């Protein structure tokens, strides 16, 4: 592994532990050349997954794109980065469990909204307002009512 400090290819692992419920290995490394310590993460390489967008174009699945969209919806809300990462993990796991190589962006949006509804109501409404592109107040109110119904059933 190249040292990010001196760019030499001589490092040794000084600590290794599973993270992310065993799906990732966190390794603490030390460069044998300059002594710089750094962290790396190892995870299983997943098969490529393509997203079919609304206009029919295809692009590679991006965890970062989902994370950025959810983070924007959760701005100034009491939602931790750990919760956001877990949400994205859950969405990706549910997609991969389907065993498909392509998925519609609409399906991804629904999976995100399903997960987000359990985390924060306001973030859910924010995400839904962009994702569903509300054109009138009645569609917005319908989403609000659905959210309120979901809460009353949960109690």
Curated annotation (Swiss-Prot):
Q: Which chain segments does UniProt annotate as zinc-finger regions (unnamed)? A: 3-34
Stretches assigned to the ATP-cone domain: 49-139
Task: Identify which cofactors the protein needs according to its UniProt entry.
Answer: Zn(2+)
Q: InterPro entries attached here?
A: ATP-cone_dom, NrdR-like_N, RNR_NrdR-like
Q: Which cysteines are joined by disulfide bonds?
A: none
A Gene Ontology biological process in which this protein takes part is: negative regulation of DNA-templated transcription
Q: Kindly state which keywords UniProt assigns to this record, in alphabetical order.
A: ATP-binding, DNA-binding, Metal-binding, Nucleotide-binding, Repressor, Transcription, Transcription regulation, Zinc, Zinc-finger
PANTHER family per record:
TRANSCRIPTIONAL REPRESSOR NRDR
* Membership in a protein family: Belongs to the NrdR family.
What is this protein called in UniProt?
Transcriptional repressor NrdR
What is the organism of origin for this protein? Lactobacillus delbrueckii subsp. bulgaricus (strain ATCC 11842 / DSM 20081 / BCRC 10696 / JCM 1002 / NBRC 13953 / NCIMB 11778 / NCTC 12712 / WDCM 00102 / Lb 14)
* Taxonomy of the source species: Bacteria, Bacillati, Bacillota, Bacilli, Lactobacillales
